[in-house]
């Protein structure tokens, strides 16, 4: 079941609008969010999207590619826990990782710079060393 992102059939005042076509279009459909969470094993889902392209969704994450700005070196490190999410505090409460989430890793606290539900990988920048 998809999510409908097409034009609404209600006016701001609450009245009904008339449809300008009889059927809904496929390009008006969306998808549900991935809600990437922590787990022991990573799991990715590959989907075909509009135009025949491929989107890799990261469903469960265990590791992140963390860049240390001082040394300018990237390392693959284990994620220990989700600290906070500026986008929505409920996401942090459920342990969901999105862009901008602060995560605790083996190196220290890092901020996620990639979109795990769109890219299929977690990239982060170290902001606080242990």
Swiss-Prot record:
InterPro entries: Ribosomal_eS8, Ribosomal_protein_eS8_arc, Ribosomal_Se8/biogenesis_NSA2. It comes from Ignicoccus hospitalis (strain KIN4/I / DSM 18386 / JCM 14125). Belongs to the eukaryotic ribosomal protein eS8 family. The keyword ATP-binding does not apply. Keywords: Ribonucleoprotein, Ribosomal protein. One of its GO terms (biological process) is translation. One of its GO terms (cellular component) is ribosome. Gene3D superfamilies: 2.40.10.310. This is Small ribosomal subunit protein eS8. Transmembrane segments: none annotated. Part of the 30S ribosomal subunit. CDD domains: Ribosomal_S8e. The lineage of its organism: Archaea, Thermoproteota, Thermoprotei, Desulfurococcales, Desulfurococcaceae. One of its GO terms (molecular function) is structural constituent of ribosome. PANTHER family: 40S RIBOSOMAL PROTEIN S8 (PTHR10394). HAMAP family: Ribosomal_eS8 (MF_00029).
């Amino acid at each position: 079941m998809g999510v409908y992102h097409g034009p609404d059939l209600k006016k701001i005042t609450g009245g009904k609008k008339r449809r300008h076509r009889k059927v809904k279009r496929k390009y008006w459909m969306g998808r549900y969010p991935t809600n990437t969470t922590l787990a022991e094993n990573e799991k990715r889902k590959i989907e075909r999207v509009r135009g025949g392209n491929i989107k890799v969704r990261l469903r469960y994450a265990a590791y992140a590619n963390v860049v240390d700005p001082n040394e300018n070196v990237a390392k693959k490190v284990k994620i220990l826990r989700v600290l906070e999410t500026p986008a929505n505090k409920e996401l942090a409460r459920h342990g969901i990782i999105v862009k901008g989430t602060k995560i605790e890793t083996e190196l220290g606290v890092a901020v996620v710079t990639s979109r795990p539900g769109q890219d299929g990988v977690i990239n982060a920048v170290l902001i606080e060393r242990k």
